[in-house]
Curated annotation (Swiss-Prot):
TPR repeats lie at residues 35-68, 72-105, 120-153. Its main location: membrane. It comes from Prochlorococcus marinus (strain SARG / CCMP1375 / SS120). This is Photosystem I assembly protein Ycf3. It holds the Pfam family TPR_12. The lineage of its organism: Bacteria, Bacillati, Cyanobacteriota, Cyanophyceae, Synechococcales. Gene3D superfamilies: Tetratricopeptide repeat domain. Essential for the assembly of the photosystem I (PSI) complex. May act as a chaperone-like factor to guide the assembly of the PSI subunits. It is found in: Cellular thylakoid membrane. Keywords: Membrane, Photosynthesis, Repeat, Thylakoid, TPR repeat. It comes from the Bacteria.
């Protein structure tokens, strides 16, 4: 096992060196390059499970990044961390900010729907059907948008929309 870890570590380092070289050669402003470096470091930390470091790097990237699509991607990754940590309200708020930057992110809508649907199920299990329906309707609303942005990409969601009678889309493909 140690040799595999050494090999992976070598590949990570090699990739980092190559990526840094590419970033240096990119014909973009220094500020944008630094934003990308922070984003890349945040993404690496997130993949390694170091969410605190990831969030710090993403915050620094957002201070420098001006491109709305890139800002949206950074915010989406931050929301994923909040969701993983169980901070659903902060995740929802951050997904919304990501969508304000780039409204064509179906994964943000999908994840928001997961939170809404989870809340609906919890209320339903406690016998609060009227309250649960509010959350299920919210899930249906964002999931319908996600399905329209990514037809055929979320078959489980399409099935949920159809089986719950909340489908407002006749044809998904």
């Amino acid at each position: 096992m140690p040799s595999s870890n050494n090999k992976d570590n070598f590949l990570d380092k090699a990739f980092t060196v190559i990526a840094e070289g590419i970033v240096k050669m990119m014909p973009i402003a220094a500020k944008e390059k630094q934003a990308y470096i922070y984003y890349r470091e945040g993404f690496a930390a997130q993949n390694n499970g170091d969410y605190s470091e990831a969030l710090e790097n993403y915050e620094e990237s957002l201070k420098l990044e001006e491109n709305a699509i890139d800002r949206g991607e950074t915010l989406k990754n931050m929301a994923i961390i909040y969701m993983s940590n169980g901070d659903e309200d902060k995740a929802l708020d951050t997904y919304q900010k990501a969508l304000e930057q780039n409204p064509k992110q179906p994964s943000c809508l999908k994840n928001m729907g997961l939170i809404y649907e989870k809340r609906g199920r919890a209320l339903q299990q406690n016998g609060k059907q009227d309250e649960s329906d509010i959350w299920f309707d919210k899930a249906a609303e964002v999931w319908t948008k996600a399905v329209r942005l990514y037809p055929g990409g979320y078959l489980d969601i399409e099935n949920w929309l159809k089986t719950t009678g909340r489908s407002k889309v006749d044809i998904y493909l």
